């Protein structure tokens, strides 16, 4: 952060209020997995993340979609429907990666937060949801990664990271 680079952090679903309080002053973009929370508590969690220092707070809740809190505004995007679901492992990670890629690709030379985000955030959420849905069509890699040695071409999903 001292170098002027934005810090993004995925808190997963194992965050506590105490952990957020200790961590969020150092975080610019926070992702909270909130599938385990009722709808009202999700917005409270986003508000808490913003109060504690995150410029952008993101909450994901699987099939219920995602929410982003920025500058007092709450954005919602529905989940994209996967053509087929093989495994949801990694969908949240894929969402956050695509969300960040979209914001970075539209940032311009002035930096990530210099331009108005009111139109960039909904676009990033839509792209992130679509990418997460595509990820659900793949088997998860926990404990069973795919060897990369000798590969010369990207998979269609890897090519799609260009958004």
Regions found by a protein language model. Give the residues of each.
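Conserved beta-alpha-beta core of the PfkB/ribokinase-like small-molecule kinase fold
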Residues: 1-48, 65
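Conserved phosphate-binding/catalytic region of the ribokinase-like
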Residues: 43-163
């Amino acid at each position: 952060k001292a170098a002027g680079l934005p810090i993004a952090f995925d808190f997963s679903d194992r965050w506590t209020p105490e952990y957020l309080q200790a961590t969020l002053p150092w975080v610019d973009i926070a992702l909270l997995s909130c599938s385990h929370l009722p709808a009202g508590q999700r917005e409270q969690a986003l508000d808490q993340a913003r109060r504690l220092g995150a410029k952008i707070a993101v909450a994901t809740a699987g099939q219920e979609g995602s929410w982003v809190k920025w500058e007092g505004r709450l954005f919602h995007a529905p989940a994209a429907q996967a053509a087929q679901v093989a495994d949801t492992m990694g969908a949240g990670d894929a969402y956050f990666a695509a969300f960040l890629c979209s914001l970075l690709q539209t940032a311009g030379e002035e930096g990530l937060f210099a331009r108005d985000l009111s139109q960039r955030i909904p676009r990033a959420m839509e792209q992130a949801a679509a990418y997460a849905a595509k990820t659900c069509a793949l088997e998860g890699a926990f404990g069973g990664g795919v060897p990369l040695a000798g590969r010369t071409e990207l998979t269609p999903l890897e090519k799609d990271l260009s958004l």
